Amino acid sequence: MELEGSSSGRRQLPSKLEMSRGAYLAWEDLTVVIPNFSDGPTRRLLQRLNGYAEPGRIMAIMGPSGSGKSTLLDSLAGRLARNVVMTGNLLLNGKKARLDYGLVAYVTQEDVLLGTLTVRETITYSAHLRLPSDMSKEEVSDIVEGTIMELGLQDCSDRVIGNWHARGVSGGERKRVSIALEILTRPQILFLDEPTSGLDSASAFFVIQALRNIARDGRTVISSVHQPSSEVFALFDDLFLLSSGESVYFGEAKSAVEFFAESGFPCPKKRNPSDHFLRCINSDFDTVTATLKGSQRIQETPATSDPLMNLATSVIKARLVENYKRSKYAKSAKSRIRELSNIEGLEMEIRKGSEATWWKQLRTLTARSFINMCRDVGYYWTRIISYIVVSISVGTIFYDVGYSYTSILARVSCGGFITGFMTFMSIGGFPSFLEEMKVFYKERLSGYYGVSVYILSNYISSFPFLVAISVITGTITYNLVKFRPGFSHYAFFCLNIFFSVSVIESLMMVVASVVPNFLMGLITGAGLIGIIMMTSGFFRLLPDLPKIFWRYPVSYISYGSWAIQGGYKNDFLGLEFEPLFPGEPKMTGEEVIEKVFGVKVTYSKWWDLAAVVAILVCYRLLFFVVLKLRERAGPALKAIQAKRTMRNLDRRPSFKRMPSLSLSLSSMSSRRHQPLRSLSSQEGLNSPIHY
């Protein structure tokens, strides 16, 4: 796209062939507000922004902290929060279009990756999850290797990403891996939220250089960036400079220095242009200047010709904003937006999420999750070691418990400890599961796979570890304590442990989906498990529990009560115990658990186990429902919040009086405003612009 003339700065109108190869994104009068329903004014995050992004070019959105960089990026990508309202025009190739999974990709600021996988494994699994199932392994492998080469990851392709116990790739390499995952499906538009944040200058350069290579492939790249080095800044084609939600400059990056010079704020020769731009519009530098002057207040400060030292930042910013509105750059941008809005481009092929089949996704997710569990020391291996140590301790403390009268209490105590406290140890896997949930949320938002396939794959991959925990714990304690002999009793004992541990795992999944915070999740999970143990019939017998609430229904929906009752029946029924006083008849196990512990023996122990299984299924279904509600309720709440906001703003004269919105509020509500939606259904906010 060459310029027609240096004076106009306008590019040639793209042809239909060019349109079919790329995505031209344009926005006009884009405004984002957070309503204040009190007496205070409505807060504007973005104010009537105009701009466009074209294929083959990389745009930088710059500005100080709080200037609206991420808000603008989220507005264009359809990821705005539910408590904000967006108005304006957003056009793709001159018309309304869905910003869908196959069209756009979004790289978040945080690199959400499984640290136990290598770079190649991470990209390969992502490819199998999303690429068409009819593609051969060789074709998928070629795409993976090509992506690795494109992002310059060939030197670290066989190194693990890294986590708390394994050192992995560098921060810049992690960022490039995140970018590689998003460009596997060759999206037309790539959004990035501060990809250079936290990176050194060399790593930041390699990341932006990789983005430049992606843009050259005919894709539209839009990235927010905070304060790039001069070498990194030179890689950007276009610049959108923001301050307090207002446009300070939009145009070619190399022309920004000229604009600042024309406005009376030239960039010194040896100063980084991006540093100079931020110095002009960042009010924090006023405090720095005042501090420097204050430290030299004893000496007479000589007059300086530097306008940055003589003018307040608010004055500089206001002058820049006004100069830009009247500049040739703003006129050129509006003219280009008009051209792009009148383009009759070709319809773009949009893929609806992943193109892999459900079964392929299940196999891929199960394999990836199983490898992650095998390599993550804290997921299951540490717990297995703890279970072995605790099982040996329990077995030796209750060794050969016997059949005396005192052994009754010993058997009950041992069974209650195994059912309650040993299953409580499953809470130790919560941190690792929380990290996996972060990956799920990120991939689900990008349309990799569905909720059901994730839940099923997680249980299948964890099944061997849960079996190992149950068999190891059951074998050690059963043989050392010498519970009732017989293989069927041993099998029931192990199954009871297996399903009890599975219930706790499922409960912690529900907690993680509702309270996705490490510390609060542990506290919540521990509290719930504590209630389950208190109502299990071990600390207080079930018949003695208060009938209201605790007995009915809490004890019936507590897996602990069913697991303990089944354990008592499995161990006591068929045994006889010595009486308290010599000469009295022996006590049968049935009398002990029914008369002493209040356990009904009218139904089989297998029904108790079936109740535990039913609770397990209910927790898994609840996990599914919570995830779906989070997913489905988000867009609905956004729409409700948007309508409520616009109704309230319509009655707010302070909102109408602001000069930044030239259109009436009723016009915005009826013609321009659309409900805020998720990325899968965010549409352009209007038909082509009419002048």
UniProtKB/Swiss-Prot annotation:
Q: Which SUPFAM superfamilies match?
A: P-loop containing nucleoside triphosphate hydrolases (SSF52540)
Q: Which residues carry this modification: Phosphoserine?
A: S664, S670
Cellular component terms (Gene Ontology)? membrane
Q: Which UniProt keywords apply?
A: ATP-binding, Membrane, Nucleotide-binding, Phosphoprotein, Transmembrane, Transmembrane helix, Transport
Q: Region entry Disordered: which residue ranges?
A: 657-691
Similarity-based family: Belongs to the ABC transporter superfamily. ABCG family. Eye pigment precursor importer (TC 3.A.1.204) subfamily.
Can you say what this protein is called?
Answer: ABC transporter G family member 15
